[in-house]
C-alpha cells in the first residue's frame, strides 16, 4: 500500500505580515519531501505577499523540505483557490487546508497522518476529513488583540473551529482539516457561493455522502486573529450574514445557540414594554440583563486566570458583547438577503 501524501493548500490575499512564518512552518515539516507538496494561491495581493511566496518557491527548489509552487487565483476567494488546487492534485492522497496567517509545529503533518491512519484502522474505513486543534497565543500584546485571542477560545466565544476539546471524536465543523482527496472529489469540491463558511459547508456535505468527519488533538495550530474590537465586529457581522445565507440551502445548518442573543434581547424588550401591565415583567428583564453581565464577567475572570493577563477581566466581556451583537445583526442582514458586508480583514477582497 502506497504511503499517504499531502498537498498543502494556502490561499492568500495581502498576507505579508504572516505568510513568511506560515511557509517556514510548512517547509519545516518532518514529512519526507516525496510525500509533501505546497501550493500557494494568490488572489491578487497588492502588498509584499507575492514576493514572500516567490522567495520560498526559489528556496524550496534546492531545499530539503517540500516543493513550493505559486499560482494565481482569479476567483480571489478561498473556495475558488481550493477548487483550483483540487484540479492540480497529482497523486496526493490528502489535502491539508491552511491559511496564510496560521502556522504549525514541525511534526504537525507527520503526527496527523499517523493519527489518521490509526483512527481508520480502528473504525475499519477511510475518513473523509480530520480536523485539528487551534491553540491560542496570548503574549501580552495590545489589549484588544489579547482579549480577542482569549475570547475566541472561551466557552461562550469559542465554538466550531475554535472549540476546546481533547482526544479524537466525530465533529460537525472541525478546523484546518486533512481531507482525503477522494472524499472532496465525491462531493464536487467547495461551493464557491460561500466566501465565508465554505469549509463547514464542505464537511457537512462530506458527512452526508457517508464519509466520517472527525477532529483530533494529535497536533495543533496557531492562528493570528483580529487585532482590534472594530475588526472583531466586522468578523462577527460577516460570519452571521453568511451563516444565514447558508441556511437558505438547509435550515438545519443553523444552531439554536446562535439565536440566543436575539431571544434574550426580545425577552428583555418585552419585559420592559409590559412592565405597566404584567406584574414582575420588569424584574424578569433586569434578571436577564444581570445574568448575562455576570456570566460574561465570570468568563472574563476565568480567562484572565488561565492566561495570567488581568486586563482580560474586562476585555473578554466587552468582546463577547461585540461578537454577539454583530453576529446577530449579521444573521438578520443575511435573512433579509441584503448585500454582503465588507471583508474587514482584506479590503481588496470586496467586489
Language model regions located:
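A conserved acidic beta->alpha catalytic loop
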Residues: 42-51, 101-105
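Glycine-rich, basic loop-to-helix element that forms the pyrophosphate-binding segment
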Residues: 72-90, 111
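Short beta-strand-to-loop acidic/aromatic patch adjacent to the donor-nucleotide binding site
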Residues: 92-103
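Conserved donor NDP-sugar-binding/catalytic core segment of glycosyltransferases
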Residues: 107-144
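Short, flexible, basic/aromatic active-site loop/helix in glycosyltransferases
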Residues: 132-138, 148-170, 174, 249
Amino acid at each position: 500500500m502506497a504511503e499517504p501524501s499531502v498537498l498543502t493548500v494556502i490561499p492568500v490575499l495581502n498576507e505579508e505580515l504572516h505568510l513568511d512564518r506560515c511557509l517556514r512552518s510548512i517547509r519545516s515539516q518532518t514529512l519526507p519531501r516525496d510525500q509533501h507538496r505546497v501550493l500557494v494561491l494568490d488572489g491578487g495581493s497588492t502588498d509584499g505577499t507575492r514576493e514572500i511566496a516567490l522567495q520560498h518557491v526559489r528556496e524550496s527548489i534546492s531545499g530539503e523540505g517540500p516543493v513550493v509552487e505559486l499560482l494565481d487565483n482569479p476567483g480571489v476567494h478561498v473556495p475558488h483557490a481550493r477548487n483550483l488546487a483540487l484540479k492540480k492534485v497529482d497523486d496526493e492522497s490528502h489535502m491539508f487546508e491552511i491559511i496564510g496567517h496560521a502556522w504549525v509545529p514541525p511534526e504537525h503533518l507527520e503526527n496527523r497522518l499517523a493519527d489518521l491512519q490509526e483512527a481508520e484502522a480502528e473504525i475499519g474505513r477511510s475518513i473523509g476529513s480530520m480536523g485539528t486543534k487551534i491553540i491560542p497565543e496570548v503574549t501580552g500584546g495590545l489589549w484588544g488583540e489579547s482579549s480577542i485571542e482569549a475570547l475566541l477560545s472561551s466557552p461562550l466565544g469559542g465554538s466550531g473551529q475554535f472549540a476546546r476539546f481533547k482526544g479524537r471524536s466525530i465533529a460537525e465543523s472541525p478546523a484546518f482539516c486533512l481531507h482525503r482527496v477522494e472524499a472532496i472529489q465525491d462531493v464536487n469540491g467547495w461551493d464557491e457561493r460561500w466566501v465565508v463558511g465554505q469549509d463547514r459547508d464542505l464537511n457537512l456535505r462530506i458527512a452526508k455522502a457517508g464519509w466520517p468527519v472527525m477532529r483530533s488533538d494529535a497536533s495543533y495550530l496557531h492562528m493570528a486573529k483580529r487585532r482590534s474590537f472594530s475588526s472583531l465586529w466586522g468578523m462577527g457581522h460577516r460570519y452571521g450574514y453568511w451563516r444565514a445565507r447558508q441556511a437558505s440551502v438547509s435550515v438545519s445548518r443553523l444552531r439554536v445557540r446562535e439565536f440566543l442573543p436575539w431571544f434574550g434581547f426580545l425577552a428583555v424588550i418585552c419585559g420592559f414594554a409590559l412592565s405597566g401591565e404584567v406584574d414582575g415583567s420588569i424584574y424578569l428583564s433586569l434578571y436577564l440583563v444581570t445574568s448575562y453581565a455576570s456570566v460574561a464577567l465570570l468568563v472574563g475572570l476565568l480567562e484572565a486566570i488561565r492566561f495570567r493577563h488581568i486586563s482580560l477581566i474586562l476585555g473578554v466581556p466587552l468582546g463577547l458583547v461585540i461578537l454577539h451583537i454583530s453576529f446577530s445583526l449579521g444573521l438578520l442582514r443575511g435573512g433579509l438577503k441584503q448585500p454582503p458586508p465588507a471583508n474587514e480583514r482584506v479590503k481588496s477582497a470586496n467586489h
